Each structure stands twice: as structure tokens, then as C-alpha cells.
Amino acid sequence: MNSNANNTPIAIGISQVFPCSYLDGQQEQLLVIQEETLDPILFERLLAIGFRRSGSAIYKPRCPRCSACQPIRVPIQEFVPSKRQKRTLAHNRDLTWRITTEHTETQYALYEKYIRERHFDGPMYPPSKAQYEQFLFCHWLPPTFIEVYDDNRLVAVAVTDTLPNSFSAIYSYFDPDEERRSLGVLLILLQCRLAKLQGKAFLYLGYQIDANRKMSYKRLYRPYQILTHQGWEYSQVC
């Protein structure tokens, strides 16, 4: 693959096959960018062809017998919140939010609580600071944190990459004791709002996996586009 207008090649490797963490009985295999450092423009080009970031690693599924992972993005300037999403915004009017690139112990403490109480049966359990930093941080692209507060108490965090023409949602976590607030929904809506204010074209949400119920929420932000063999296409599948 060529990395820029000068046709400088970049190396792409392929991982071993290992059990899929999203679909029982399936096997996973990844294409992995082998470069130690990328620039935001190149990374955004890779997002547009289906790659994702985890830590400093850039990868794309290339599974032997499965194509369930569908890259999904929201065209921000066309996005309109649904009635339910508008109710979520109204219900959380009492909360405040701020944008920072600072990493704090309070953020990690909330992440640890979230994983212990909401994902104790998943691959991210048990949480650790080393795992947290390896998963979210990238030495060539510092992430942006959208923090949500109830008075002075941190209740939710969205971790996102800010790129020239888009946002890329990396991960969101929140206080499990505040489940009635639908903070996961709120965090995506805040990313949409911020992206629109900054004139971005897209919010990349990662991979939509229809067969995994926990991943189905990504289709709720409309309109959205799915990356197919023909390119990015609008979809109305619920």
C-alpha cells in the first residue's frame, strides 16, 4: 500500500488466526500496519478503507471464514438525533462536559469500575492501568477525552481521535450506577455534536457486528454508512 502522494510504500502484516472475541465459534485474523509512526492524514485514509486503532496498532479484520465486521460511520453534517436520542439529551441537561487531552487518575478509576461491573465476563477483565494505557493511548496521535460531570463528579468519558476531516470513536465508559441516564448514548451524541461544531465530515464508530447484540447500537445513529465492496453506502437497516 502507498502511504502518501509520493507513493512511499508502507508494510502490512497479517496476524495468526485466533478465537474471535465477538462471535462464539468464529476465528479472527487481522491485517496489521507495520509502521511505528503514522501521520493523521494517512491514518484517516486508513480509516476510510476499514482500518481501526487499538493503542498504536492499526488493524483491519481479514478473517478466514467470516465477514461480520462492517466498518460504520456517521456523515456528521446529515446526522439528526432521533426522538429517543433527543430525550436522552434533555434528560441529561443538568450534566456538564469538557474536552481535554489530559490523562488523569480519575478517568482510570472510572474505567476500572466500569469494566469490573459491566464487562466482568469479557476479554478486558480484569482491568489494569497497563492494559488501559496500551488499549487507548497512541504515541503518534494523543487521544481526546470528552468528560461528563455531575457537579464535580466524573460520570462518563468518551475517548476519540481528532483527525483533519473526522472523529474516530475509540472507547466510551461511564459510571454503572448512572444507568438510567443512558450515558453511552449521550457520549456518542456529544461526539456527533462536537464533530459538527468543528466542521468534520464523519464520526467513525468502528465495526458493526449484526450477530452480536451488544454491537447493534451503532445503527441507531442515522443516517449512517457501511463500507462494502463497492465503497461506503448508506444503509437503513435497523
Swiss-Prot record:
Swiss-Prot/TrEMBL catalytic activity: N-terminal L-glutamyl-[protein] + L-leucyl-tRNA(Leu) = N-terminal L-leucyl-L-glutamyl-[protein] + tRNA(Leu) + H(+); N-terminal L-aspartyl-[protein] + L-leucyl-tRNA(Leu) = N-terminal L-leucyl-L-aspartyl-[protein] + tRNA(Leu) + H(+)
Keyword Transcription regulation belongs to the record: no
Keywords: Acyltransferase, Cytoplasm, Transferase
Keyword Hydrolase among record annotations: no
GO molecular function: arginyl-tRNA--protein transferase activity; leucyl-tRNA--protein transferase activity
Residues making up the signal peptide according to the UniProt record: none
GO biological process, one term: proteasomal protein catabolic process
One GO cellular component term noted in the UniProt record for this chain: cytoplasm
Enzyme class: transferase
Subcellular location, principal: cytoplasm
SUPFAM superfamilies given in the database record: Acyl-CoA N-acyltransferases (Nat)
Main function: Functions in the N-end rule pathway of protein degradation where it conjugates Leu from its aminoacyl-tRNA to the N-termini of proteins containing an N-terminal aspartate or glutamate.
Annotated protein name in UniProt: Aspartate/glutamate leucyltransferase
Gene from which this protein is expressed: bpt
